[in-house]
A protein has these predicted regions:
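Active-site-proximal helix-loop-helix substrate-binding element of RNase H-like nuclease domains
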Residues: 32, 37, 41-58, 63-146
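Entry/capping segment at the start of metal-dependent catalytic domains
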Residues: 1-30
Length: 146
């Protein structure tokens, strides 16, 4: 394995927009719900962690291996969340050396900072669905009591 593309969905009661990713993952109720990945450009696989599925040892080792290049849109978020998920000691995170951020690469080329915006500008056949965005917000963002 040379590369792994990663996309995760998470939950935390902490508002990430107001507090940032570090506080977000420190919440007692933080969890990774879904882990999608593709190895060396192959078929995308989805691990439903929220329903008891587990990452294979091969994937865990790839996350820890600095020789495997990890790609993600907003890689900093994925890296910090997965550091917590892997139960690394507090203040210890996966090494950024082996991570590549497609959001930053997109911005470098003058594209929007959102995955949805990049898809629109590039005219990609498969776009981020608005319904999916709404579902993620519903399941991954805690509700404010009324």
């Amino acid at each position: 394995m040379k590369t792994i593309n990663i996309d995760i969905e998470t939950f935390s009661s902490i508002n990430i927009s107001k507090s940032g990713v570090y506080k977000y993952v420190e919440s007692e109720d933080f969890e990774v719900l879904l882990f999608a990945y593709s190895i060396d450009g192959g078929k995308t696989e989805i691990v439903d962690i929220a329903n008891g599925e587990e990452l294979s040892e091969e994937i865990i080792q790839a996350l820890l291996d600095d020789n495997v290049i990890k790609w993600a849109f907003n890689a900093q978020f994925e890296r910090i969340c997965l550091s917590r998920f892997l139960k690394l000691p507090k203040g210890t995170y996966l090494n950024p050396k082996s991570w590549r951020c497609t959001m930053i690469w997109s911005a470098y080329m003058g594209l929007p900072f959102s995955l949805e915006g990049v898809g629109k500008v590039l005219g990609l056949e498969k776009q981020k669905l608005i319904e999916g965005k709404d579902l993620i917000k519903y399941f991954c963002v805690s509700c404010t009591p009324t």
